[in-house]
């Protein structure tokens, strides 16, 4: 399971700066749910050989009045559900009453916590950080998030114990930037073979009360207990093995666990972190939407995270029975308008309560998974790449035409196509989108996003046949070239 790292601290200690650096800024806001998360942000990070979800909890300005009264409920939830807490302090401002209050709360929760003294650039760091040892949370790590100094080491120190305990293998590829990482055809082949031997992991997600539990029970064909009061039950999703028509699945049920803080509270408690972890651990995501409410901002936020995670996707519009035809037409129009950016995903209109349309979901789930894991040869990908060039040439960059040489598979689930050539890193985003759509149409990819990676370099097969032509072969070649030229003149 992918670890979750929560950034905690009072305002203006550098949490947002660290968050943007960890998530590389360009895809920092992968899941921002207005009205639900308030000042909390979620992002995917890859650093020091580890992949993890990072959560910016927002600032805590409470001091002597008590941490519980000043910390937002969502920030409390982030601490509860995080695997590792990074407690950021300001080395220049020194220890404050707010820092002491936060430390007291963290000690009471017994969370794995690391104290990080930020903004150590340009000062005597050791002297400035000495007082933070009095927080009683162990070693104090020095960092300058704005300059990036100490960030990688801090992540490695904080995640290594958790990774060792959970059996997570550190990636030793030496490159933490997904865009710069070398994707090899051999690795893709191994990944494709590995996926063929595993059951399909299906995550059922959606905002509260859209019918996820009802749909899960309908799929399983049995009633399941969905309310638990034992400590820790809100932490992780439930994994349910099942088999359907000879194919093995693992349902990742994010709605099967609820928490009742009060006896009369029956509304499902929505855990964003639990949902995001389920998405990361899945092969296919089934997003459930309430037909009566239409597309909500939370739905769009979840879709953003699914796309960034590269997971195959099927959409189920639930509670379709019993609504008027004019309402159905309005919902379909809204879906077309607001979900145009995921036109590759199948949309089903179902009733989980009565079972209408539920059986057809698995046809699309299998189709999406097969598209995400189907092996494609280098020759086919290179041919499609050449066809895309013939239809629309790459633009000029600094007066020179970008030259695309060959393409190969770089991974599966999601399908990754690696394009090699000269100046490919300078291709404009518009041409990259054109190529991505061209590959999607040509490969008939349904139900899964497709990713393109561009790498500088020549054809690996160049120079293999360096044997010099004989005199007779050279003469024959000249005659052939002359014949072709004469034919073209005619």
UniProtKB/Swiss-Prot annotation:
Where on this chain does GTP 1 bind? 9-16, 56-60, 118-121
- Going by the entry's taxonomy, the superkingdom of the source organism is recorded as Bacteria
Task: Please cite one Gene Ontology biological process associated with this protein.
Answer: ribosome biogenesis
Residues passing through the membrane, by range: none
Q: Where is the KH-like domain?
A: 374-458
Q: Which Pfam families match?
A: KH_dom-like, MMR_HSR1
Amino-acid positions noted as binding GTP 2 in the UniProt annotation, renumbered to this chain: 206-213, 253-257, 318-321
| UniProt keyword annotations, A-Z | GTP-binding, Nucleotide-binding, Repeat, Ribosome biogenesis
User: Example GO molecular function term?
Assistant: ribosome binding
List residues of the EngA-type G domain: 3-166, 200-373
Quaternary arrangement and interactors, per the entry? Associates with the 50S ribosomal subunit.
Role according to the record: GTPase that plays an essential role in the late steps of ribosome biogenesis.
Q: Which family does it belong to?
A: Belongs to the TRAFAC class TrmE-Era-EngA-EngB-Septin-like GTPase superfamily. EngA (Der) GTPase family.
What is the recorded name of this protein?
GTPase Der
The organism's lineage? Bacteria, Pseudomonadati, Pseudomonadota, Gammaproteobacteria, Alteromonadales
């Amino acid at each position: 399971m992918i670890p979750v790292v929560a950034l905690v601290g009072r305002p203006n200690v550098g949490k947002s700066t660290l968050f943007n650096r960890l998530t590389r800024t360009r895809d920092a806001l992968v899941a921002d749910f207005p009205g639900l998360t308030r000042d909390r942000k979620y992002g995917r990070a890859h650093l020091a050989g580890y992949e993890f979800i990072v959560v910016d909890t927002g600032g805590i300005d409470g001091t002597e009045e008590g941490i519980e009264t000043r910390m937002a409920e969502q920030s409390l939830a982030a601490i509860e559900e995080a695997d590792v807490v990074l407690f950021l302090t300001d080395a220049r401002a020194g220890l404050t009453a707010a820092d002491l209050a936060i430390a007291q709360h963290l000690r009471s929760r017994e969370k794995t916590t690391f104290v990080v003294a930020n903004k150590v650039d340009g000062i005597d760091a050791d002297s400035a950080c000495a007082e933070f040892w009095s927080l009683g949370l162990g070693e104090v790590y020095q960092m300058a998030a704005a300059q990036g100094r100490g960030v990688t080491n801090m992540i490695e120190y904080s995640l290594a114990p958790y990774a060792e305990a959970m059996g997570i293998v550190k990636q030793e590829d030496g490159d933490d930037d997904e865009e710069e990482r070398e994707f090899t055809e051999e690795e893709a082949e191994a990944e494709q073979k590995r996926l063929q031997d595993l059951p399909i992991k299906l995550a059922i997600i959606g905002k509260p009360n859209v019918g996820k539990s009802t749909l899960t029970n309908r799929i399983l064909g049995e009633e399941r207990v969905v309310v638990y009061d034992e400590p820790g039950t809100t932490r992780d999703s439930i994994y349910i093995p099942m088999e359907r028509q000879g194919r093995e699945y693992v349902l990742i049920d994010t709605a099967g666990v609820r928490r009742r803080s009060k006896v009369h509270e029956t509304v499902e408690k929505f855990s964003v972190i639990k949902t995001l972890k389920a998405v990361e651990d899945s092969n296919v995501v089934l997003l459930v939407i309430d037909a009566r409410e239409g597309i909500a901002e939370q739905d769009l936020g979840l879709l953003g995270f699914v796309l960034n995670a590269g997971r195959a996707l099927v959409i189920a519009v639930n509670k379709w029975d019993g609504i008027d035809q004019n309402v159905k037409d309005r919902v379909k129009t809204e879906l077309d308008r607001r979900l145009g950016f995921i036109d590759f995903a199948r949309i089903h209109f179902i009733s989980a309560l009565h079972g209408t349309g539920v059986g057809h979901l698995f046809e699309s789930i299998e189709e999406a998974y097969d598209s995400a894991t189907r092996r494609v040869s280098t020759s086919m990908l290179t041919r499609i790449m050449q066809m895309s060039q013939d239809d629309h040439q790459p633009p000029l960059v600094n007066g020179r035409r970008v030259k695309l040489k060959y393409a190969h598979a770089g991974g599966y689930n999601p399908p990754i196509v690696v394009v090699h050539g000269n100046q490919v890193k300078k291709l404009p985003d518009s041409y990259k989108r054109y190529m991505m759509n061209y590959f999607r149409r040509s490969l008939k990819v349904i139900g899964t996003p497709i990713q393109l990676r561009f790498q500088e370099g020549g054809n690996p097969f160049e120079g293999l046949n360096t044997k010099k032509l004989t005199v007779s072969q050279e003469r024959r070649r000249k005659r052939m070239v002359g014949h072709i030229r004469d034919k073209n003149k005619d």
